[in-house]
Curated annotation (Swiss-Prot):
Coiled coil location: none
The protein's name: Spermidine/putrescine import ATP-binding protein PotA
SMART domains: AAA
UniProt membrane topology term: Peripheral membrane protein
Catalyzed reactions per annotation: ATP + H2O + polyamine-[polyamine-binding protein]Side 1 = ADP + phosphate + polyamineSide 2 + [polyamine-binding protein]Side 1
GO molecular function: ABC-type putrescine transporter activity; ATP binding; ATP hydrolysis activity
CDD domains on file: ABC_PotA_N
């Protein structure tokens, strides 16, 4: 991608707070017009990146580049980058209209221009009827919309959102996710969003940056992150995962290997390179696994085991299976399986203790080295 297609870049950026390393040698390119999410647990460095982009922090080393220009020492008010904070930071004594127009007023814009742009911003977030209200008379979701309107009214190059849904209830969070994504498409500007919620990141983003302990673990589309995790950390962080321990026993061709997994021979597919005898970890999402009744065994290789638990979740059923152990006296591996619920399918009504055969959809496995990479 050409350099001019990036609105923001971090090049070799590290950030220290006293002796604590918050970010370590970060390289990140943010594309014009994309919805990018920084995803990770508390303390991983995602908010520090946001503060570097906004200008509230400066890097200890490396460069922050905005539209091709190094902006390490450029203050926030000169970057044309706006931030929506967790607490919304609305002025309680001002009306909604005055809150949204505050930045334009500070820029000494003409009154008629302020009125027009505030009106357009409020219409964009469906609050045109609430201009005369004070923040205290608004719901949490409405306050958030005001904060967003105030941020976009200045026509920023980039809008930064720091876990803005954290104070909202579940249904309102879901609604706001759709509204924010629609708004981003409508405006056509770059949104950089911070969250620890994987579902939130996947629902809204063009690309996701998975972070851990001040480092970037993987960058990719939601589908790439979920289906092709770069390592065990990413696989575990973005959803439920089953991990089978195994050994490569032979190579059939460029992508197909024979392996022994939990004591059972299986073929596995991977683009990674392995040698005979290499220890591996095979990763399977719960929805990739298939269960078979013992009176209807599948062709090819399969595990055997027993149902331990079933959990009804409405659209799906979670099924816990204990595999038969390859070693006498040792418990077998426990697997989590997810199946779509069908009340007319008698075979999905498993009972604890029931024997089953276990397979998966060929090619959907992820094979990593024994070190989890």
């Amino acid at each position: 991608m050409a350099e001019q297609d990036y609105i923001f870049e971090l090049r070799g950026v590290s950030k220290y707070f006293d002796d604590t390393c918050a970010l370590e040698n970060i390289d990140l390119q943010i594309r014009n017009g994309e919805f990018l999410t920084l995803l990770g647990p508390s303390g991983c460095g995602k908010t520090t990146i946001l503060r570097l982009l906004s200008g509230f922090e400066t890097p200890s080393s490396g460069d922050v580049i905005l539209s091709g220009r190094v902006v390490n020492d450029v203050p926030p008010e000169q970057r044309q980058v706006n931030t929506v904070f967790q607490n919304y930071a609305l002025f309680p004594h001002m009306t909604v209209r005055d809150n949204v127009g505050f930045g334009l007023k500070m820029q000494k814009r003409p009154k008629d221009e302020i009125a027009r742009r505030v009106r357009e911003a409020l219409k964009m977030v469906h609050l045109e009827q609430f201009g005369d209200r004070k923040p205290a008379r608004l719901s949490g979701g409405q306050q958030q919309r005001v904060a967003i309107a105030r941020a976009v009214v200045n026509n920023p190059y980039v809008l930064l959102l720091d876990e803005p849904f954290s104070a909202l209830d579940f249904k309102l969070r879901k609604k706001m996710q759709l509204e924010i994504k629609h708004l981003q498409r409508q405006l056509g500007i770059t949104f950089v969003f911070v969250t620890h919620d994987q579902e939130e990141a996947f629902a809204m983003s063009d690309r996701v940056v998975v972070m851990n302990d001040g480092r970037i673990e993987q960058i990719g589309s939601p589908q790439e992150i979920y289906e092709e995790p770069a390592n065990l950390y990413v696989a575990r962080f973005v959803g439920d995962i089953n991990i089978l321990d195994g050994t490569i026993t032979a190579r059939r061709n460029g992508v197909l290997y024979d392996a022994t997994l939990e004591g059972v021979p299986f073929p596995v597919q991977t683009g990674k390179q392995f040698e005979t005898g290499d220890r591996v970890k095979v990763l399977l999402r719960p929805e990739d696994i298939r269960l078979h009744m013992m009176h209807d065994l599948p062709d090819g290789e399969y595990f055997t085991g027993a149902i331990e638990e079933t959990v009804y979740k409405g659209a799906t059923v979670d099924i816990v299976v204990r595999l038969d152990s390859p070693s006498e006296g040792q418990p077998g591996k426990q697997l989590l399986v997810a199946e779509f619920f069908n009340e007319d399918d008698e075979e999905i009504n498993y009972t604890p203790g029931e024997r089953v055969a276990v397979t998966w959809v060929n090619g959907w496995e992820v094979v990593l080295g024994d070190d989890g990479e």
